[in-house]
């Protein structure tokens, strides 16, 4: 599905009956979470709350509440096509050397298409139609959700944060939640390994006394949002990748108060800065783990300016015990990850991040095993190849006769092909999600790999069991007279 901006995407979803307008008054304080959660768990549509009490702005939720809508946001019609996007990323990340002139010529369209999707810079952008500055800046006028009863304050959840480190031309995009502190202040919660945090660390080293410019986009088009959470190779900007997904170049405009760029069609943009040394305790908040997270200090984001379109739409979500919107997004992105992994490790048959494992804390991998110890190599590969799997605590490796997405298959393999002592790998003192309160130290914990493959000589001294299967000719013979047995 091709679209130009968020509003065009909303209109097309509505025409397909994949978006529902809610005209009944629903409060962003807790009530929207209940409605959105019930609809998401039933596989229902995206929601546009048009009557938000005490606010003059509609709220969009559940935009990516089904895998189908994630695929549509990536310009595709089905989840199957997301594998092709993964293959595109794999080709751009590590292109194969051409096998000859004909092969080199066939690769030119892909390269040309990527180069032609460089962002287009414009002035007079829609997102700057209205400007709030100085005393006009008031974040409390935005219908920011309070998602759970124990949340300390309203929380921006779909903020697309743009930063740039010193001496860098490429801008970084990331999704970081932001706690409302006051009319012009938010807390920027980003983990130390994320792009925005790394830019800020580099800035503080280079300019220890100077303010760090930041821009936050609320209500970008889906392709730009999805590009920010996809493992785009360093050779391609997120904006160029968004253009590839959308089928047209991303239109960017320069912020009014700094030299960062934001999507021209964005609904709302927050411009401001981080002051070195200015931090505040963030949380607690209900999170995607299904628990409230502990309180930690993060930088304070001072908002100097708010710009927006005519009649802006506020884009929001909630996070909680799966399934939630990030979990659905994780299921879709799982399909994008597979070709990236297979490019580097062709023996991988399937890779699955179960949503009930918070979409990243547990991975099941099936492989065509080729030698003793092969499963352990794959464990290390998962933990190290893509930064998205840095926090994956458990990796289960099975043979390719096992369905990675069927727990009955996986549990059967674990209980029949594993010896707990021989086939379990423990790695201590590794990076762990700060939200993982089960780890003994915040941000540092252990990982477990489980080898549920059949064992080869060198891995066992015993004769290995042969799986039970029925003869094919017997199956065919019984199937031929099955309808005569009076059985369903």
UniProtKB/Swiss-Prot annotation:
Instruction: Quote the function comment for this protein.
Output: Catalyzes the decarboxylation of 3-octaprenyl-4-hydroxy benzoate to 2-octaprenylphenol, an intermediate step in ubiquinone biosynthesis.
Please name the Gene3D superfamilies in this protein's record: Single helix bin, UbiD C-terminal domain-like
Name of the protein in question = 3-octaprenyl-4-hydroxybenzoate carboxy-lyase
Molecular function, one GO term: metal ion binding
The record lists prenylated FMN as bound by: 175-177, 189-191, 194-195
**Which source organism?**
Legionella pneumophila (strain Paris)
Q: Which residues form the active site?
A: 287
Q: GO cellular component terms?
A: cytosol; plasma membrane
The pathway to which it is assigned is: Cofactor biosynthesis; ubiquinone biosynthesis
List UniProt keywords, sorted A-Z: Cell membrane, Decarboxylase, Flavoprotein, FMN, Lyase, Manganese, Membrane, Metal-binding, Ubiquinone biosynthesis
Q: Which residues bind Mn(2+)?
A: 172, 238
Task: Enumerate the Pfam families for this protein.
Answer: UbiD, UbiD_C, UbiD_N
- HAMAP family reported in the protein's UniProt record: UbiD
Reported cofactor(s)? prenylated FMN; Mn(2+)
Q: Does the keyword Transmembrane helix feature in the UniProt annotation?
A: no
Which InterPro entries does this UniProt record tie to the protein?
UbiD (IPR002830), UbiD-like_C (IPR049381), UbiD-like_N (IPR049383), UbiD_bacteria (IPR023677), UbiD_Rift_dom (IPR048304)
